Amino acid sequence: MNQSIGILGGGQLGLMLLQASIDWNLPIHVLDPDAAAPCRSLCRRFVQGSLTDYDTVYRFGQDVDILTIEIEKVNVDALETLEREGKRVFPQPAVIRIIQDKRRQKQFFRDHNLPTADFVLTENRAGVAEALRQNPSFLPAFHKLGRDGYDGRGVQRISSEADLPKAFDAPGLLEKAVDFEKELAVIVARNEQGQLQTFPTVEMVFHPDLNLVDYLFAPAQISAEVDRQAQAIARQTAEAFGIVGVLAVELFLTKTGEILINEVAPRPHNSGHHTIRANVTSQFEQHWRAILNLPLGNTMAYQSAAMINLLGKEGHTGPAHYEGLNDLLAMPGVFPFLYGKAMTKPFRKMGHITLMDADLETLRQRVAEVQGAIQVITL
């Protein structure tokens, strides 16, 4: 395994990929626009530059044997050129191109008979109004930007005609709101030989205002039949894309028992961070196994787990201080992971905390305790 590997993106996902690569002494190069990116201190070689500029991505890719990503917002044209020239790019550029545009992603689900919420493609704000005029029963709905939405940004709830000014005046999709009971996720990995391996289904709880994961539980508290369906849909989705690497499949469990795909991510994902401690193979090691065409690892969980996102506290912008970290480290079965970001700002992802316990109900009770024990502030 002496082939050089490049990661497009040097944030926390890249950092955890790097940490997983150390045991195998993989030579990792990283491209990121931020001179203070979390990956900088760990990688073999760091290049500061744009992820969306063709020439920058192309030149970076010429210096490595294998390319992968930690974020979808990259220049796919450059990756396609590198792939044609013989570089190994995983996930494949064709997969990234579909997934980085929510319009193409949703159309892909429809074209491949993968269950998803009803939707209409829109070109601008006027198109949203016209779609609702033709089908008023579509409300309530969400208007989503086709490109560049991330961690809840690029999504607006449209509950009535009075909300139309909130719709984006850009290409997007209008999606009928799902009356869901739970939000689930399954991470699936696939290597070049077509071997597939899924991680246990998790149950995500989203922050009510920020539209990003507040905390999750693994495994999800769902019936065996719902779990079977969720796992099957994740596998079918990975097979439909033909992806090489890790794919996170976010799902809705509706109140009528139906399972619908919300969206997918072609990379390690927030819904799998707990696997670093809680599973035999982490999602990050599994990604390396997949793109290096190695046998996929055992995804069995050691214990039930919870994962809490550690966000910058509202009203605090500046050098980060982790108040309560010592108290947190004294708690049994609690494992904090800090991302090495020097500066905090409101709701910025600064780290995560994994909790493990033999009893899932005990974990549920401890989440609030852990959340109250630590905060990321400025002094």
Name the predicted role of every residue range:
Residues G154-V249, L253-T256:
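Internal nucleotide-binding/catalytic subdomain
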